[in-house]
Amino acid sequence: MRMKPNYRNFNIMDSQEQMDVYKTMASNGYLNFSDVYRASDSGVYGKMYHLINDYSNGKFGLANTPEAINGYLQQAEYRNTDWFDILFNNSISQNHAISMSSGTEKASYYTSLSAMSDPGWTKQSSVQRYTANINALYNISQQVSLNLIGSTSYRKQKAPGTLSSSIDVVSGEVRRDFDINPYSYALNTSRALDPNEYYVRNYAPFNILHELDNNNMDLNVVDLKFQGELKWKPFKKVELSALGAYKHSSTTQSHSITDYSNQAWAYRAMDDATMRDANPWLYTDPDVANSLPLSVLPVGGFYRETKYGMNSYDFRGTISYNDVFAEDHVINLFGGMQLTATDRSKTWFNGVGMQYDMGMLPSYEYLFFKQGKEENSQYYTVEETRSREVAFFATGTYSYKGRYTVNGTVRYEGSNKLGKSRSSRWLPTWNVSGAWNMHEEAFFEDLTPTLSNLTLRASYSLTADRGPADVTNSQAIIKSYSPYRPFTDIQETGLHIVDLENSELTYEKKHELNIGVDVGFINNRINL
């Protein structure tokens, strides 16, 4: 169970302290009518000036008298809104699972089902997850067995709407437009505000509860995995194994910004000439002389969808040999190969003018696409990546009477991420190690129990790493792009070199030597 956060845990001013600051600013001329009334973001004073200016049904929203103004400000002074209590929930998550197993000496089965439900810690935040697993083992004969595994999961999640952050390259400031993160809002919003009132953000009416209802995201995640492994023991001490697996993962993120969200309203907020000229979400057509800013979203909202897909194939074949000679010599040998192929995709689409209250009917304005063309922005993208890896490996261990142990490992690996030259794309890595268990020697009995364990060990290895995933210039990376052009009739597509070819791009290698001692005292009560 998760409890709501509490303001006692934070050093945040209450509404009375905040109103004292506002009143001081107003008395010094910082909160005058002309600036606050048309401000892009305003709270108590902005709402007060809007009420004073609003005239309907034969009267003003708020009388422009000292008594009425002081009464309005006094209400805000004593409001002390607990945003954590309003935006957060005391949530209890539920997990339910059931499993079944049965079988005989020839075949055994295991299945399980589970369901999880989390109502969420904040408004418009919830998760449901469902999983299923099956594992079947068939002993076809004493030498041959087949293991089949299947698993699937589905996750449905809801979250407040959000846009990607941007960085001001001059000041280094990180900002996020139309941010409605409940935790950030509760920490940074004045407690003098009325949770049921609409204030101003981005030149448009804003209420956090209303915005969470009209600006949210739905995530649907599906994972599938199928695996089969065949084992064959042609001899008592030899085992062959072949494993194949397929994994699929897909994620769909749907961002619904309805007609009545603050984000949609901001694209058509132009109550007067001052607001119209200052609103950055309006568009001025450069092809029309002396044109005024206008809305590229006269009706509807946005429907943005991002899809991630992944398909992975794995195959591994191995052989192992384990034997003991004369009860003193232990040999373990293991070798095999592995092939991995992974395809990933990402698509993004920006649906403009979606009318959610009109049967999801799109009604787009051509100027939106004209503006995007002039700003060199995209309204849909497609990305694909392919990864291919092959590896051959072997390891061997020899032990004599448990006293002396020698181990060796070698791996020969290649990846399409690295340079096309054979020495760069393929790299052998290896490890050699040894250990001497002195406590197994006969002379060690004279040292017990004071010295109960003593092992000397050493290893030397060459390890490697393929490096960061974003480094892929084993061949020249050439991407298409749209050069910036101020007018739509002179647009063109170009190619530019992102990274020059590095045909010698290879693994990050590391040679490592380790020498150590393990010591135990007083029947291993103290170990070093």
Residue ranges of each PLM-predicted region?
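Residues embedded in well-ordered regular secondary structure
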Residues: 1-124, 162-164, 213
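The feature captures the catalytic groove of carbohydrate-active enzymes
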Residues: 195-198, 265
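Conserved, non-catalytic sequence blocks in retroelement Pol enzymes and Pol-derived host proteins
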Residues: 179
